[in-house]
């Protein structure tokens, strides 16, 4: 039996955050011309969690099989965010920008881009292949929970996540997450099992 499985957990628990400083993350002209697997994470802010997971397996034989499974958990619980007066001459702005990146890829690409606090993003892929097999199964599932989040703002929250001129000419699978703000949860799950 060829089995590929991804099990992943992301948790933000009981964090206390006082935001006064700006935060920036930028990608430009990156991750191009790749054959195979590409995992890209770009984050600006605080307590952001990002993951790219890939599991691949193969087998051969008349009594073999192929199984692929993805399971995930994302949990934000008991977090307190305070957006206070910025330091003099600055702002509490949080920016994550991606430009002219992740292009001309053959294979699998998982991309996460986040600006803010407590954002959770993940791209999971499980691939299983068996030749002359008698069985193929694929499954994907999980849980996302936001609970007990407290936000205090003395100024407007200023977060921007932008993607321009990117993710072009990709052959295969693409999982893309783009988020700005607080406690956003995003998942792309792909589970494939094949016999031939």
Role assignments for model-derived ranges:
Residues 1-196:
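Low-complexity repeat regions of mature extracellularly deployed or surface/particle-associated proteins
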């Amino acid at each position: 039996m060829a089995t590929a499985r991804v099990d992943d957990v992301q948790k933000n628990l009981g964090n206390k955050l006082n935001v006064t400083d700006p935060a920036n993350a930028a990608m430009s002209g990156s991750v191009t011309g790749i054959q195979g697997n590409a995992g890209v994470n770009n984050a600006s802010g605080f307590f952001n969690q990002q993951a790219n997971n890939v599991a691949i397996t193969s087998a051969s034989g008349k009594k073999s099989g192929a199984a692929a499974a993805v399971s995930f958990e994302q949990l934000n619980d008991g977090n307190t965010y305070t957006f206070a007066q910025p330091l003099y001459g600055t702002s509490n702005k949080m920016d994550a920008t991606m430009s002219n990146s992740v292009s001309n890829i053959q294979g699998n690409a998982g991309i996460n881009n986040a600006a803010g606090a407590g954002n959770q993003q993940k791209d999971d892929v499980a691939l299983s292949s068996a030749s002359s097999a008698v069985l193929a199964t694929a499954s994907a599932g999980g849980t996302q929970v936001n609970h007990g989040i407290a936000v205090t703002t003395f100024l407007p929250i200023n977060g921007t996540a932008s993607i321009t001129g990117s993710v072009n000419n990709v052959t295969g699978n693409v999982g893309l997450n783009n988020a700005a703000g607080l406690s956003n949860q995003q998942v792309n799950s792909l589970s494939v099992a094949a016999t031939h």
